[in-house]
UniProtKB/Swiss-Prot annotation:
Coiled coil: none annotated. Residues 72-131, 137-194 form the CBS domain. GO terms for cellular component: plasma membrane. It holds the Pfam family NMB0537_N. Keywords: CBS domain, Cobalt, Magnesium, Repeat, Transport. Signal peptide: none annotated. PROSITE patterns: CBS. NCBIfam families: PRK15094.1. This is Magnesium and cobalt efflux protein CorC. SUPFAM superfamilies: CBS-domain pair, FAD-binding/transporter-associated domain-like. Plays a role in the transport of magnesium and cobalt ions. It comes from Buchnera aphidicola subsp. Schizaphis graminum (strain Sg). GO terms for molecular function: flavin adenine dinucleotide binding.
Amino acid sequence: MSNKDTQGTDKINRKGFFSILLNQIFHDEPKNREELLVLIRDSEQNELIDQDTCDMLEGVMHIAKKRIKDIMIPRTQMITLKLNYNLNKCLDIIIESAHSRFPVMSRDQNYVEGFLIAKDLLPFMKHPEDAFCIKNILRSAVVVPESKSVDTMLKEFRLKRSHMAIVIDEFGAVSGLVTIEDILELIVGEIQDEYDDEEKVNIRKLKKCIFSIKALTEIKEFNDTFETNFSDEEVDTIGGLVMKAFGHLPSRGDHININGYNFKVSIADSRKVIQIHVTVPENKIPKKLEK
């Protein structure tokens, strides 16, 4: 038998196998998506498929209805670099955020020039005397509309071998970003990597008295951690507290003393404060944080 005949037989066998499998699971052909979902759940109840398989099948069914706008990281939460940043400034933000890919914004912050992958900075760390120009190591950015369907986006990620895309609104303005991980998590559930635990922690100890705080950390969490009593009547987050104390949007490196605690902006852009370093008075560090 020729290879061509063998391949044809294999295809028939595979088709027959899946037909038998589907017939065993779905005795009655579903008429619509809702009936199909019911049959999938019934199959799990009858132990024809396990819980994980059921969840993944449901996830695949649901992503067809979703748009990129539903799952994207909004622009206000994007951590970005600027085209005019030097090597040290890029490294500071990369180390502070622990991300691996960064949108690089134009000088006026109106559009994305491309993506920077953290590993592309390694040669410059070994040879810092080499001239560094962020534009020379940029990767091209995939740009998609908010209205794009999630399942189509997944296919595009696969075809273009890309992991991240910039999302724009109907007027062409940047509204957020989406990653392949965001989509896969809709199917298989949350994906843990070596940085996930660190990224989810809002308050991280750097030195004996210095802590890194995400600006979106709620004041209540800050108070519970440091046994303080900052008011959350007018603002909800530490970033809001710092901006209120400054009376304007502070820049990276700006610092201010609030009730004996020194708040220094470690990451910020033209729209928001992203990360803050807090120096706690030595005599006010709770015992649970002394280790």
